[in-house]
């Protein structure tokens, strides 16, 4: 069969740049990191490399078991094979591979014939026979990085008619455009499952079945923030010692996103996962940069952030050239693109209104947020069908509260809600958002607290309180988990953009921490997992948002009551 084209994406030459992997003080940083990990109960960081290595090891183990059985059968029949060759192809060699599975990092994993080396091939699906170019071997870890060149024979899951971007298979932004959406959701369920298997340190019986991934209403046109960039003029770095040479742009540089596995920027004029307003802003900003190129002495990142203005139906608003007008039934939404980091954006989640600095963090897929926040509302309180007397949970604590998404959208369930963040600017905007949504300070309030004393000023009774945590990708640290276990609220809802660090942290909450709750053994901590599910905030990519609901164990609750008595 003829090779399937790579959607116009050129194959990079052999002399291309690769991400810098070293540093002058790398050895010292590594030693400090190893010491910190030794002193911490958190023994993993859930990095891309750690996740990939777990999948590589699992594939090799599965392959080795199958191979051992085959060899045993061969010996019985007198047809035992000789040992396979252990030599590896030289870098930049083109090879043919058949993809076995997709890793939790979003890349395909393949085993070459007669090889115990796993090849990582981006933009591929199980069953694909592909041509790939070897980039680098990690012999000790038994895997190799490759570049995708083309599909020779597509596997049963691949459907190239679904691809909606000419830069797919080159741009690093999307990994799954060739997969039907139901297959993307199924794969993301396995990401959550493997995260808890590989990183939680929990016995299988302590981890409930992961629910089916909840999909996004929009699979394209959903992303409300994009940050394309361009590099500085060629030769911008100092080339004559201390003096340096100031370079000017001689032509408009590529403006877009990184080519997969490199530091090269691809010139991308449009991104189909962006909302219409963001895509409109991308086109206008590309024109502006080209017209004002003499103002730039170095590269820059361009902010594209959607903002929404809610307009009444009467009088009907007039369309604007720089805005997208959407009919939302009872009102119109006028969507514009904000490009000033210091500007403000407005977003609506159902009827909740949020204002934020354009450059600040806020969820980037508004189409799924109503479903997402409703799920949290439905699961934040104990289930009423448990047979036990319902716990009277009166208080919400929103740790890592940011601009108040959970504090505000969950406020109707609690007499008092408190958002906590270490950023004073986030707290300022959260307080503003509470006022915008007519929440009195005695109903929903916010405080900026130092990480070392996050719960020090909390007066809510622990058995009447639920805590929502939504940390950054690195997850919680030792100190926060220690404080949370000492406080021991009745329930914890853990939201995470990195299910691997979430699994690690949830494992600590379930197994406990020595010297804090008397735990530190299989399931001997304060909490048990009630439910696990993934949300697809970023269709066409390998990312999944995880939600874990934890309930304080009955024995722990009885100990807490005993303390109060």
Language-model region placement:
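Structural motif
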Residues: 112-114, 259, 349
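A short, compositionally biased
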Residues: 102-107, 249-253, 338-343
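Hydrophobic beta-strand signal
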Residues: 131-133, 227, 303
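Extended interfacial segments that mediate partner engagement and assembly in macromolecular machines
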Residues: 152-153, 159, 163, 169-290
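Rossmann-like S-adenosyl-L-methionine
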Residues: 3-16, 22-26, 37-70, 274, ...
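Terminal RNA-binding accessory module
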Residues: 2-162, 167
